[in-house]
UniProtKB/Swiss-Prot annotation:
Name used for this protein in its record: GTPase HflX
Residue ranges constituting the Hflx-type G domain according to the UniProt record: 212-382
Name of the gene: hflX
Quaternary structure (record): Monomer. Associates with the 50S ribosomal subunit.
Species the sequence originates in: Akkermansia muciniphila (strain ATCC BAA-835 / DSM 22959 / JCM 33894 / BCRC 81048 / CCUG 64013 / CIP 107961 / Muc)
Regions of compositional bias (Gly residues) in chain numbering: 152-167
Alphabetically ordered keywords of this record: Cytoplasm, GTP-binding, Magnesium, Metal-binding, Nucleotide-binding
Length: 437
């Protein structure tokens, strides 16, 4: 959790604040404040209160005006919060000003998300990616850690000299810390370059084998990992918590027509996902960019389902994957009335021209429809046919096994008779060997 400045104990009660300026934004800001409550609760911190603060204008010092800032200070005192969490992204200087005003820990939405990511990271790659994002966030904020030296020096025996000595010590240490942080950032970036190369090698091997790929994307906690577990028949960690999955998990499945498909689960998205996290996780999120198509999972039971769908598209556009072919899975339809399901499909229609598959992943309903939708998606990439290969071309038989899926093999007088599903490019090369011409 977050350490309170000048106190060794940990944060127990946080007051949540969202500052907004346009009255028409009040509804959306309230929804985001509710989401922030879920995020903070995922850190094990109690909620002392949450408040929407309307400000006429944006101010550089506190984001809102001084009068509103004093109002926030009083609210924090009244609810006995030991931390104030802003849904707004605060600049380093705004964060410092707020901490001076309320005399408690002040953090923003980005720091909350970074802390959750740090707790969820399991693999070396995910740990490095989160560490990189956190250090880039902390670098311009290092002066906060030494604020207490100013206060201690100014209030203890040395008068001006004591304060200057404390400040001097703090300033020297800040510079040392910054140099160490920059060196660590560079070291992490070098290590992540190696990870990116390893991923590229793995992708080339998959391309050589001509195995189709799909990436499962969507808002955090929409049911992506549960979907992968269902269709692959293998256990994938799926927990009812935000950002349970930070590491990509890939499973090979077989579609109804026999073609193999590699399905990859990806990290969940969220509104205002910090750009530095998107950058840090680029090597992981490339799985979505380079997949043949996407499966976006939408929690149909969530009142913000359409907004979550739009947020996912925004992040995909940022990654350069916004134009990928996509299947949309409306998950948890067992929890919503029929008319709500129809309304959702209508609301998605202006944004999406692909296939919508209603499912209840938890109940196992709709799996067949999804697999058939995947077959339809890949039909333009593969062909199924019978081939008669002369015995003198055993190299082609071996290639058919490695490049596609062979269903049957029969040895006849003229050669080897095979029924197979092949990628279109390889199929075209073998058209002269079609058995049913």
């Amino acid at each position: 959790m977050f350490e309170i400045r000048e106190k060794p104990e940990m944060v127990e009660r946080a007051m949540l604040v969202s500052v907004y300026f346009d009255p028409s934004e009040a509804g959306e800001k309230q929804a985001m404040l509710d989401e922030l409550e879920d995020l903070v609760s995922n850190l094990g911190i109690g909620i002392a209160g949450k408040h929407l603060i309307k400000s006429r204008d944006m101010h550089a010092k506190f984001l809102c005006g001084t009068g509103k800032a004093q109002e926030v200070k009083q609210l924090a005192l009244d609810c006995r919060a030991d931390c104030v969490v802003f849904d707004n992204m605060l600049s380093p200087s705004q964060q410092r000003e707020w901490e001076r005003l309320v005399d408690e820990c002040v953090i923003d939405r980005e720091e909350v998300i970074l802390d959750i990511f740090a707790r969820r990271a399991r693999t070396r790659e995910a740990t490095l990616q989160v560490e990189l994002a956190r250090m880039q966030y902390s670098l311009p904020r290092m002066a906060r850690m030494w604020n207490h030296l100013d206060r201690q020096g100014g209030g203890s025996g040395g008068g001006k000299g004591g304060g200057g000595a404390a400040r001097g010590e703090g300033e020297k240490q800040i510079e040392v810390d910054r140099r160490l942080a920059r060196a660590r950032i560079e070291a992490i970036q070098r290590e992540l370059v190696l990870v990116t190369r390893q991923r590229a090698t793995q992708r080339k091997e998959r391309e050589r084998q001509a195995v189709a790929t799909a990436a499962i994307v969507g808002y955090t906690n929409a049911g992506k990992s549960s979907l992968l577990s269902l269709v692959s028949g293998s256990e994938v960690m799926a927990r009812d918590m935000l950002f349970a999955t930070l590491d990509t998990t890939t499973r090979k499945i077989e579609l109804p027509h026999g073609q193999p498909l590699l399905l990859t689960d990806t990290v969940g998205f969220i509104r205002n996902l910090p750009h530095r996290l998107v950058e840090a996780f680029k090597s992981t999120l490339e799985e979505a960019v380079l997949a043949d198509f996407l499966i976006q999972v939408v929690d149909a039971s969530d009142p913000e389902a359409v907004r979550h769908y739009e947020t996912t598209l925004e992040v995909l556009n940022e990654l350069g994957a916004g134009d990928k072919p996509m299947i949309v899975v409306l998950n948890k339809v067992d929890l919503v009335p029929e008319e709500r399901r129809g309304a959702l499909e209508t609301l998605l229609a202006p944004h999406f021209s692909g296939r919508v598959v209603p499912m209840s992943v938890k109940e196992g309903n709709g799996e067949g429809d999804l697999l058939n939708a995947c077959v339809e998606m890949l039909e333009s990439r593969v062909r199924r046919a019978r081939f008669l290969i002369p015995y003198t071309r055993s190299d082609l038989v071996a290639a058919m096994h490695s490049e596609g899926k062979v269903f049957s093999t029969e040895y006849v007088e003229e050669g080897t008779l095979l029924e197979a599903v092949l990628p279109v490019a390889f199929y075209n090369k073998l058209e002269s060997f079609l058995a049913d011409r």
